[in-house]
Regions:
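DNA-contacting surface of Y-family translesion DNA polymerases
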Residues: 142, 149, 157-298
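Gly/Gly-Pro- and Ser/Thr-rich, intrinsically disordered tail segments characteristic of DNA damage-repair
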Residues: 1-193, 201-203, 241, 325-354
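Short, charged/polar surface micro-motifs in flexible loops or helix N-caps
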Residues: 5-7, 260-264, 308-311
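Short aromatic/hydrophobic contact patches that present stacked aromatics
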Residues: 38, 74, 254, 270, ...
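Short, hydrophobic beta-strand segments
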Residues: 73-79, 266-269, 316-321
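A short glycine-rich, hydrophobically flanked beta-strand micro-motif that places a catalytic Asp/Glu
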Residues: 107, 111, 250-253, 300-301
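Short small-residue beta-strand/loop micro-motif enriched in glycine and branched aliphatics
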Residues: 38-39, 263-267, 313-314
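Acidic, metal-coordinating catalytic segment for phosphate/diphosphate chemistry
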Residues: 158, 273-354
Length: 354
């Protein structure tokens, strides 16, 4: 499932995966690996409807559900055996049967005593497996497994670990906790715990948002400064709109660029005050772009806001180096009120038309 040749793969069937096709892979690369693939356009409304139906089934088992995406979630079934008259394993088996019967969908279940192990177990036997990692079996199960099983250990992290002689959980277990932290920072301390099957994160139905971002892939690679500037402003507006809707602000602005050769370039700047203003987000991202220089052509441009905090902390002191910033902020708030009353196109900036 994916878009045109300049899009990316949303997901792939298991036959395509055998040939090397993966989610988020550029479509042109996927078609080289699997030239006879049938490309299906995404049907987001259908996926959202199915996700909501499955979520309703989950809520009949427990209120403690933490969604990860449309098709994946953590559930905490602690203490529910008496309520349902059956242990969690039985209730989860009934859930997957109900999904097949009512929705025609399969699901993979991973059951364990913490989130890390449940995630590992859910990936063991897709597309419709059921794997359990018991507390007593944790160490023996993990010992010979590769560290790439750890959620978040991608190719770059795996290469760094291999340079340190760490390829398996057994290798991790041989490292002293302080040595791991000294070499890999906070990630090293996390790895020390995960190597022992320890994960104290709770299932949270209201996990805080960590970042807000927007990006676009161009139909054709471009180095046109006006076109890039127009897109950057529109993305800053979208990020700002989402921050305002969530009553959030952020202290870190990130710029993301992907060149024609698919190499990624990312830059970020920390602001003195958190912001939710499109003008501040745009000017910060534009400054990062100017520092990079126009090394295009580019195939992708992105803008993001992170280190999120309540909007009450936003835009407090103004910018002493830019006295006009306060007036621009006031003008933006006024424009927001006009759009709220008359619609999103009631007032536009000229650069948004580029």
């Amino acid at each position: 499932i994916g878009g045109g040749r300049r899009g990316v793969v949303s997901t792939a069937c298991y036959v395509a995966r055998i040939r090397g096709v993966r989610s988020a892979m550029p479509m042109f690369q996927a078609l080289k690996l699997c030239p006879d693939a049938v490309i299906i356009k995404p049907r987001m409304e259908a996926y959202v409807d199915a996700s909501r139906a499955i979520r309703a089934m989950m809520e009949e088992l427990t209120p403690d559900i933490e969604p990860l995406s449309l098709d994946e979630a953590f559930m905490d079934l602690s203490g529910t055996a008496r309520l349902h008259g059956a242990p969690p394993a039985v209730m989860l088996a009934r859930l997957t049967r109900r999904m097949r019967k009512e929705l025609g969908l399969t699901g993979s279940i991973g059951l364990s005593h913490n989130k890390f192990l449940a995630k590992v177990a859910s990936d063991l036997d897709k597309p419709h497996g059921f794997s359990v990692i018991g507390r007593a079996d944790t160490q023996s199960f993990l010992r010979d497994k590769p560290v790439r099983l750890i959620w978040g250990v991608g190719p770059a992290a795996q290469a760094a670990l291999e340079q340190a002689g760490i390829r398996s959980f057994a290798d991790l277990l041989r490292w002293d906790r302080r040595d791991l932290a000294a070499r890999f920072g906070s990630t090293g301390d996390r790895l020390w715990h995960l190597a022992r099957g320890e994960d104290n994160r709770r299932v949270s139905a209201h996990a805080p948002m960590k970042s807000i971002s927007n990006e676009t892939t161009f139909h054709e690679d471009t180095a046109d400064p006006d076109l890039l500037d127009g897109h950057l402003w529109r993305m800053a507006e979208k990020v700002s709109d989402r921050a305002k809707a969530k009553d959030l602000s952020g202290r870190v602005v990130t710029l993301k660029l992907k060149r024609s050769d698919h190499s990624l370039l990312s830059r970020r700047i920390s602001l003195r005050d958190a912001t939710q203003l499109a003008d501040t987000i745009y000017r910060s991202a534009r400054g990062l772009f100017d520092q990079v220089g126009n090394e295009g052509p580019y195939r992708l441009l992105g803008c993001g806001l992170s280190d999120l905090q309540p909007a009450a902390e936003a835009d407090r002191s103004g910018d002493l180096l830019d006295p006009a910033a306060v007036k621009r902020g006031q003008a933006e708030r006024a424009a927001d009120r006009i759009r709220a009353r008359f619609g999103p196109d009631a007032i536009l900036k000229g650069r948004s038309l580029r």
